Amino acid sequence: MTTSDLPAFWTVIPAAGVGSRMRADRPKQYLDLAGRTVIERTLDCFLEHPMLRGLVVCLAEDDPYWPGLDCAASRHVQRAAGGAERAGSVLNGLLRLLELGAQADDWVLVHDAARPNLTRGDLDRLLEELAEDPVGGLLAVPARDTLKRSDRDGRVSETIDRSVVWLAYTPQMFRLGALHRALADALVAGVAITDEASAMEWAGYAPKLVEGRADNLKITTPEDLLRLQRSFPH
């Protein structure tokens, strides 16, 4: 499938979190990664894609860092209010897309602000494999290590069959209308939503797993940032 044959898409980047585990003086999406902020590098892969229709970044109301970035002035990038949790931020982002003219059956990709190493190859693979899918899905990586389940005392209770276990990554790609309904209903029901796929699962769907690269890391600890520094030229 050529690039022009890939489906057009919108993107939502939830970026209202603080990232307290980084022990930094600012949210992790604004930390330096080889001369640019993490979030700028995260946005690059989407803004450089010819099938992108538009991108919404969900930000804390008092965010002092975003306005100073070059990407904040891009005509392809819009801002939405961040929520108290990820699900609320994404829901606000979807509503902003509807205001921008997105339709219920349009594809939306939700991606972590602190996951800056997404490759064009992985993005295109996700778009291609899900282009005709009735549900949508997500980038994921098969578990490679032996997995153990613990009891309440921190002792092994069983070994889990890793052949059926995947690590959920982003982007996660769904139809705007279906994802909006799933998130809104889950929030009303008080369901704990950790990612968009979990909302779709709760709504009765079975998202497709699309294998991606393991180095599409989400920055969670200072060690993650140091590891990714080696992936970007200075």
Swiss-Prot record:
Give GO BP annotations, semicolon-separated: isopentenyl diphosphate biosynthetic process, methylerythritol 4-phosphate pathway
Q: Do you know which InterPro entries this protein is assigned to? A: IspD (IPR001228), IspD/TarI (IPR034683), IspD/TarI_cytidylyltransf_bact (IPR050088), ISPD_synthase_CS (IPR018294), Nucleotide-diphossugar_trans (IPR029044)
Residues flagged as site, Positions MEP for the nucleophilic attack: R162, K218
EC number(s) stated in the UniProt entry for this protein: 2.7.7.60
Instruction: Indicate the annotated site residue(s) for Transition state stabilizer.
Output: R21, K28
Keywords tagged on the record: Isoprene biosynthesis, Nucleotidyltransferase, Transferase
Read off the Gene3D superfamilies from this record: Spore Coat Polysaccharide Biosynthesis Protein SpsA, Chain A
What is the reaction catalyzed?
2-C-methyl-D-erythritol 4-phosphate + CTP + H(+) = 4-CDP-2-C-methyl-D-erythritol + diphosphate
User: Where does this protein act, in terms of pathway?
Assistant: Isoprenoid biosynthesis; isopentenyl diphosphate biosynthesis via DXP pathway; isopentenyl diphosphate from 1-deoxy-D-xylulose 5-phosphate: step 2/6
Q: Which family does it belong to?
A: Belongs to the IspD/TarI cytidylyltransferase family. IspD subfamily.
**Functional summary from the UniProt entry:** Catalyzes the formation of 4-diphosphocytidyl-2-C-methyl-D-erythritol from CTP and 2-C-methyl-D-erythritol 4-phosphate (MEP).
List the protein's name.
2-C-methyl-D-erythritol 4-phosphate cytidylyltransferase
Q: Which organism is it from?
A: Pseudomonas aeruginosa (strain ATCC 15692 / DSM 22644 / CIP 104116 / JCM 14847 / LMG 12228 / 1C / PRS 101 / PAO1)
Gene designation per UniProt: ispD
